[in-house]
Amino acid sequence: GLVGSEMCIRDSKGSAFDRVTVQNVMDHASGLAFEENYVDPNSDFFLYYAPALNLGYLPGAADLQPGQTEIYGVNDFLTHFVQPDPETPPGMRFDYNSANADVLGWMVSRLMNKSLNDIIRDEVWQKIGAEHDAFIAVDRAYIPVATGGFNATARDAARYGMMIRDKGVFRGERVLPADWLEHMVDVKDSDRNAMNLNPNYSQADWIAYQDMWWILDEITEEFCAVGIHGQVIYINRSTDTVMVWFSSQRDAASTLAPEFPVKLNAARAAANYLAEQ
């Protein structure tokens, strides 16, 4: 059956996440009434979320202490500020929102009773033979940030991509469950519809968003992880390909930036060309 987020985080009771399932969160289809806008200085993201994340500058925000503001850390923002969209039931429409990643990180940390950075270190990073330490940003309350907080070298990101390509196995060792890594490319009509209902993505190459991955083709099992500045882990299982690139697009708009499709199409063409050699 479906698992509600409130079963993982009791603190989410009464919040916008009270009505959603974990799958809704992983598919960014949680029906939130919160628009993610990185550049509008009057947006809720700019005024409340970014300062709580410690990833945005607002005069005086870094000096605030607990009790001086209702929204001190990210968890406060998730439980006290984000509201449900009454016109968008959970599961209906894809709408990328960083709050989903943060509530997912919160759930994983609660379920495993460990900090997110320790979980990543013990369950993933040490098992993929990473060449370098990664680091994760913390919010204003010194809690690890799941959205946009993780930093690694390109080579280590490629190692992670290779493990995902091989359905959770790296150099013969099981790192992540195969079921999840197979499920994300099991695209159904409802998943396609959720993407198509968002006018921002209806003309893009993505066919769906599932389990925190952007899906390009469920037959060839081609998909990506994408950051807001255009940084990408590109995976194509049919061509046995993993590509990683960093980026600094002019606008923080992830896949909606005009220069993004050019880079993605080049990667797709290169993967197909190399597979034919």
Question: What function would you assign to each model-found segment?
Answer:
Residues 1-4, 8-9:
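Single conserved hydrophobic/aromatic residue that forms the stacking wall/gate
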Residues 13-128, 154-168:
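Active-site-adjacent helix/loop patches that line small-molecule binding or acyl-intermediate pockets
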Residues 131-135, 185-242:
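Active-site Gly/Thr loop motif
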Residues 120-186:
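Active-site-proximal binding-pocket segments
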Residues 24-27, 95, 132-136, 149-151, ...:
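Structural recognition of the beta-strand scaffold that forms the well-ordered cores
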Residues 222-277:
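Structured C-terminal helix/loop/strand segments within mature extracytoplasmic catalytic/sensor domains
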Residues 47, 138-152, 199, 203, ...:
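Carbohydrate-binding/catalytic loop surfaces
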Residues 32-33, 101, 142-144, 164, ...:
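Solvent-exposed loop/turn segments at secondary-structure junctions
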